[in-house]
Amino acid sequence: MDTIVIAGLGNPGSKYQWTRHNAGFLFLDRIAQLEGLSIVRKQFGGLTAEWERKGKRLVLLKPQTFMNLSGRSVMPALQFYKLKPDQLIVVHDEIDLALGAARLKQGGGHGGQNGLRSIMELLGKGDFVRLRLGIGRPPHGDVTNHVLGVFTPPEMEIFARVLDGALDMLETALDEGVPKAMSLFNNKSYLEG
């Protein structure tokens, strides 16, 4: 059975649960809710669950290392399952995408995202798929306060649609390949219901 690790990035603890930086955790929580899974197994310095879907074993991983050390959780998972970087999908917040947007990307740099930076440092490269969930830049002020800030209720309403759209995107990528999913979904906006 093919195995893919889907790492949703975020920070552990209730203090960070609804912050923009926890977009990856929120995405995995949405999958767990829809599929009747519990992401509670302690492995690889994180919490995991396995989702069997169409002949694939999908390991949902929420690193509990804090964002800046995400690679310390992702790398052991890849080693345990003997996987290559192209068998990894990282789901993360993206300040360079507006709230209401989600994009798939194959490879690339870290763009200042510290969780990606940590993973790339340990892998030695960035040849993995990223599912980028837009949180937008702050209109003015500190980026750190923005990413660690909690979604407002109107923002959360939009972000809930982003999560469902991103799940459609992920399922298409798994079933038909990343290029097909990118062509179908990368220009969609989830601002309106």
From Swiss-Prot:
Under Gene Ontology molecular function, one entry of this record is: tRNA binding
Q: Which residues bind tRNA?
A: Y16, F66, N68, N114
Q: Look up the record and give one Gene Ontology term from the biological process aspect.
A: rescue of stalled ribosome
According to UniProt, where does the site described as Discriminates between blocked and unblocked aminoacyl-tRNA lie?
N11
Keyword list (alphabetical) reads: Cytoplasm, Hydrolase, RNA-binding, tRNA-binding
Kindly report, in one word, the top-level EC class recorded for this enzyme. hydrolase
**Which cellular compartments is it found in?**
Cytoplasm
Tell me its EC number(s), please: 3.1.1.29
Give me the Gene Ontology terms describing cellular component. cytoplasm
Q: Which Gene3D superfamilies match?
A: Peptidyl-tRNA hydrolase
The record's catalysed reaction(s) read: an N-acyl-L-alpha-aminoacyl-tRNA + H2O = an N-acyl-L-amino acid + a tRNA + H(+)
Free-text function comment from the UniProt entry: Hydrolyzes ribosome-free peptidyl-tRNAs (with 1 or more amino acids incorporated), which drop off the ribosome during protein synthesis, or as a result of ribosome stalling.
Subunit arrangement?
Monomer.
Q: What is this protein called?
A: Peptidyl-tRNA hydrolase
According to its UniProt entry, this protein's organism is Trichlorobacter lovleyi (strain ATCC BAA-1151 / DSM 17278 / SZ) (Geobacter lovleyi)
The opening ranks of the lineage are: Bacteria, Pseudomonadati, Thermodesulfobacteriota, Desulfuromonadia, Geobacterales
